[in-house]
């Protein structure tokens, strides 16, 4: 009966396996448990206590509560131990990071100390040079003072010998005073010259640094200009060859179509476009010449203004290169169109157009059937099939713009 009652109130799942077995065995045979944080001890109850199931249950419940509290305490300590372990890992990682950062800072400090030592050495050398100049100046001044003293001594001796002549003596005293004043003025002048030499030395050093930087920049600009000139000359040669070929093809095309009115209109329109392109090219050439003058005047400008002017010139050169590429592409398209047009017969048999005469409509056809094709041919060149904007406008503009760039680059290189 007592065994059945005690089994209903056991709550030993949270105890260790050995502790639970001992507790169950002791409770069955009539023993009590005393549970501490680190150990489980057993003591034998008197016979009367074992025979009292209520008291045994009360003790077991009490031990169960204490065991639960200890288990909760143990879980809490385990969690805190885990947190402390994680914090320890983080602190170690932070320590490693700080150690690495300390090494980097130590290296930077060493480099800074080395740079400071180099600067200090340069300063010492400069001070040594100035000190040498100062010593030479002081020696010169001392020599002059010695000479002045010797002159004064000689004058004094001469004055002692000529005491009888008061006028001569007075004149000698005045001359001595003048020499003394001149000596003092010479001393002041020497000190002033020394200060001026020191200032000029500093100024010369600064100008030398600026001159070195400017010379390097001008050398880079000259090299870039030479490369740009070579590229422009190469592009100009290619475009000139293309232009000659296109001109030859145009002459052939014009010779075969001199009697057509629409070619004359297209030629007039092309002339207007060429004149307009010539004006644009002249304006661009004037702008390039202005930029060249600004480049020549940039020798007196600051480094910042030189950089801005160089960027402007590079942007202009880039725009011209893009224009050259675009126009070369247009020339290629025109050549392809001309080649396809040369393979097409000029007119169908029976529909040959006589220059200066209109074509009568065929029998059985309406007169307005050919209006749309005629309107279309007026908007196109017969040789290439392109629109009324003549194909040689782009070529002329390319040649003139390229020639202007080449002239500017040549002037820049000569300057």
From Swiss-Prot:
Residues 69-103 are annotated as: 5 X 7 AA approximate tandem repeats of [KMNR]-L-[TQ]-[TDA]-[ENQ]-N-[NDK]. It is found in: Secreted, Cell wall. Keywords: Cell wall, Coiled coil, Peptidoglycan-anchor, Phagocytosis, Repeat, Secreted, Signal, Virulence. Residues 87-100, 108-125, 158-189, 260-277 have a biased composition (Basic and acidic residues). D repeats lie at residues 311-316, 317-322, 325-330, 332-337. Residues 75-86 have a biased composition (Polar residues). This is M protein, serotype 6. A motif (LPXTG sorting signal) lies at residues 381-385. One of its GO terms (biological process) is phagocytosis. It comes from Streptococcus pyogenes serotype M6 (strain ATCC BAA-946 / MGAS10394). The lineage of its organism: Bacteria, Bacillati, Bacillota, Bacilli, Lactobacillales. The keyword Repeat applies. It comes from the Bacteria. NCBIfam families: LPXTG_anchor (TIGR01167), M_group_A_cterm (NF033777), YSIRK_signal (TIGR01168).
């Amino acid at each position: 009966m007592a065994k059945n009652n005690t089994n209903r109130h056991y709550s030993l799942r949270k105890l260790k396996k050995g502790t639970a077995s001992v507790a169950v065995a002791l409770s069955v045979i009539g023993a009590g448990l005393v549970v501490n944080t680190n150990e489980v001890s057993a003591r034998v109850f008197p016979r009367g206590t074992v025979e009292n199931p209520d008291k045994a249950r009360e003790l077991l419940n009490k031990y169960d509560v204490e065991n639960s509290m200890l288990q909760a305490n143990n879980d809490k300590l385990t969690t805190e131990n885990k947190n402390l372990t994680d914090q320890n890992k983080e602190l170690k990682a932070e320590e490693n990071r700080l150690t690495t950062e300390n090494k980097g800072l130590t290296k930077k400090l060493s480099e800074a100390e080395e740079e400071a030592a180099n600067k200090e050495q340069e300063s010492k050398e400069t001070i040594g040079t100035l000190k040498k100049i100062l010593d030479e100046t002081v020696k010169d001044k001392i020599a002059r003072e010695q000479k002045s003293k010797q002159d004064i001594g000689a004058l004094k001796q001469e004055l002692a010998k000529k005491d009888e002549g008061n006028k001569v003596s007075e004149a000698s005293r005045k001359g001595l005073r003048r020499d003394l004043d001149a000596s003092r003025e010479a001393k002041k002048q020497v000190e002033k010259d020394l200060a001026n030499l020191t200032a000029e030395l500093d100024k010369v050093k600064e100008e030398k640094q600026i001159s070195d930087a400017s010379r390097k920049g001008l050398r880079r600009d000259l090299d870039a200009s030479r490369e740009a000139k070579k590229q422009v000359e190469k592009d100009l040669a290619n475009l000139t060859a293309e232009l000659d070929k296109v001109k030859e093809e145009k002459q052939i095309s014009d010779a075969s179509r001199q009697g057509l009115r629409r070619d004359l209109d297209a030629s007039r329109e092309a002339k207007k476009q060429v004149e307009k392109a010539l004006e644009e090219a002249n304006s661009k050439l004037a702008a390039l010449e202005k930029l060249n003058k600004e480049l020549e005047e940039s020798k007196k400008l600051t480094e910042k203004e030189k950089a801005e002017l160089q960027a402007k010139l590079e942007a202009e050169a880039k725009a011209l290169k893009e224009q050259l590429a675009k126009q070369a592409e247009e020339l290629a398209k025109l050549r392809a169109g001309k080649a396809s047009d040369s393979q097409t017969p000029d007119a169908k048999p029976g529909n040959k157009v006589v220059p200066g005469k209109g074509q009568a409509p065929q029998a059985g056809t309406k007169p307005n059937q050919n209006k749309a094709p005629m309107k279309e041919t007026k908007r196109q060149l017969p040789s290439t099939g392109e629109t009324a904007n003549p194909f040689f406008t782009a070529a002329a503009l390319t040649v003139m713009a390229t020639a202007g760039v080449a002239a500017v680059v040549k002037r820049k290189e000569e300057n």
